[in-house]
Amino acid sequence: MDDVDDDSTHCEASPLLPSNDNDASRWPIRSRWTELSLISRYSLPLVATYLLQYSFSVITTSAAGHLGQDDLAAAAIGVTTMNICGLAFFEGMATALDTLCAQAYGAGNKLGVGLHVQRMLLLMALATIPVGALWLSSPALLSLVLKQENLAVKAGSFLRVSLIGLPGYASFEAGKRFLQSQGDFDTGMLILVVCAPVNALLAWLFAFCLGMGLEGAALGAALANDLRPVLLLLCIAFKRSSHQCWPGLSCRAFRGWGPMVRLSAAGSAVTLAEWAAFEVLTFSTSYLSTMHLGAQTILTTTSVVMWHIPFSFSVGVSTRIGHLIGAGLVSAARRVAVLYSMLFVGIGLMDAIVLFSLRNYIPYVYSADPEIRDLVSRTMLSVACFQVFDAAICGCNGVLRGLARTSFAAWVVFFVNYLGAVPLAMWLELGPAGMGLDGVWTGLGTGLVVIACTEVTYMISIDWRRCVDNVKYREE
């Protein structure tokens, strides 16, 4: 295909770059800028969406920090457990829709988009049962792994209250993919623009005005989570253009779960392996002191806030690659993947510079304890360097999701993290090296370098045309 201008008459699956394999050298600069413009239109609303979504945890942690040191530590443990034993699964499951819905839309099977979403909602409903049982039992379970009994009780109570918002969290993750696969990345953002202030208001009201403490902050976040899918459903009902992808409630939603389950399992494994690495190390800092636990909570929260920027771009990349692969445009997909690799390195460097520049100011957002603030400031350089490699991993995983090759990423992340990075981080933190929190981030960063090199090598070696054939087989 020849060079294509930014023409509104082209659909979202149209290539903006020459798709002929023989035209690789004839890639005009304006096509590169047009592609970057498109991915920015996809991703910038997603950055706002995910940052606003993550603000729910930040607001809860911040409220806990102003309640007291024990409340901050309990919130850290509660959020950690909530992420590992719940949210990571649902977040990972939803990434399967980044693949399935985008490829179905690109292949012209628009009704398949809604069918994939229906299947995912059913799967998430089933997954809520064991997750809910685990959260209800959390006070007793946490007391088995924590030395401080009072922290186990506080964190367990936090999780029980948070369970109220779990169905809303899960269904919103699936529902917003229905619109994103059609190129609508704004609606989810606008919903969170409404819900984030509601969360802050409810957390302040319940925690401080009504004297409910940490449980009040958790309740505010839970109710705001349940509001999100309600507003999303209303938006879809009034957005008639999205109805072209809705087949109506269908018995077919109970069949053909194979691809979705496989991609959901792989997506959950990737997310869980990444998140759990942080959370295991957060637990390990409790063996240093409560102060170190509070500082690590702030550092992890800040790092994850920054991570949402490259992750948001990676979701946009998944959608774009999925559209191109679904439409059979292999050459264009390969070239934009190269372009995106440079983009993610730039994002990582930007994140690192921002964190290091603000290292003496960020701690004041979370804590009034001067010792915690000083420890956070001294460790921020390691966290800043970590961002460069974390952004590169987001880019790799975004391309792999678009190709429906998430399972490879799952294996790589799991083995590298738990056979190398996490043990190294714990040895540097607690072992003879005595690096403390700097050791945590150095160990994890070393693992990211290995993961990035492995995934890039894999993407270069695989047959992208076979990915197209798999889409045709599934969607036809």
In which residue ranges do the predicted regions lie?
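C-terminal structured "cap/appendage" subdomains that terminate the fold
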Residues: 399-400, 407, 411-418, 428-431, ...
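Intrinsic disorder
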Residues: 30, 34, 38, 50, ...
